Amino acid sequence: MLASRALLAKQAAAMLVRQPACLMHHGGDWGNWGNTNIAVVFSGCGWWDGTDIHEAAYTMYHLSRNGARFQIFAPNQQQMHVMDHMKMQPSSSDNRNMMMESARFSHGQGMMQMNDLSKLDANSFDAVIFPGGHGIVKNMSTFSKDGKDCKLNNDVERVLKDFHRARKPIGLSSMAPLLACRVLPSLEVTMGYERDESSRWGRWPNTNMVQAVKSMGARHNTREPYEAYVDEKNKVISTPTFMWETDYHYHYIFDGIGNMVKHVMRMTAK
């Protein structure tokens, strides 16, 4: 009898190992499974001149894992410049469109999956998420030139105000809280640490942005890169992610995005 039970247990375990991950894990207990529609807004493709590829991919992964449907959007306009990510300097011979660059995230389905930000209607979605990257301060706003007095891309400003007015969740990672704090009143956000407390694990080189959001009237809350801060009143969820520069602790960024998405999904169910 014991031998038979052991054999059955072994066979059951073997069957589970062969099952696709999606059959073993149906996501979190957040949102309306399979019926939550999220708009994800990109600003190009690449940390130094658009949306960071890790933050973009992690956002789409966690949305998928939690049963959300999502569509990707970007402004149909030219980038401020194109950065050579090897030399860390602008390329003088290149000029690229944010929407065309963001289509790189569409798994080769740009014509079907990529959307012009000017067409984004808050009435058609349950929430919006802005992953980070220097496109936030170069393409979606003039922060890289004007600092705290920056202006936002017209459609970026409209979308943020529309979702806020509709009491729908807004997810923001790394630099993206700058956008919301510039045009929405009395927000509570996190962009990580307020001082560059460098360690052998990483550092916080963009604390000037933290001071900027505070000068815009927002309340800043210190959080680790793997955490999220939830402004329940305004339904704004932020996570520091790559405000923290690290050479290899990317799992912290993955977890930070996951926590942000979890709370976005939770709030869509309210």
Curated annotation (Swiss-Prot):
Sorted UniProt keywords: Mitochondrion, Transit peptide
Q: Name one GO biological process term.
A: mitochondrion organization
**What SUPFAM superfamilies does its record include?**
Class I glutamine amidotransferase-like
Matches recorded under Gene3D superfamilies: 3.40.50.880
On tissue specificity, the annotation reads: Expressed specifically in the inner segments of cone photoreceptor cells of the retina (at protein level).
The principal localisation class reads mitochondrion
Localization, per the record, is: Mitochondrion
Tell me, according to the record, the phenotype of the null mutant.
Morpholino knockdown of the protein display decreased eye size and formation of smaller mitochondria in cone ellipsoid photoreceptor cells.
The record's GO CC annotations read: mitochondrion
Q: Which InterPro entries match?
A: Class_I_gatase-like
PANTHER family hit by this protein = ES1 PROTEIN HOMOLOG, MITOCHONDRIAL, ES1 PROTEIN, MITOCHONDRIAL
Primary role: Plays a role in promoting mitochondrial enlargement in cone photoreceptor cells in a fusion-independent and ATP-dependent manner.
What name does the UniProt record give this protein?
A: ES1 protein, mitochondrial
Q: Give the species this sequence originates from.
A: Danio rerio
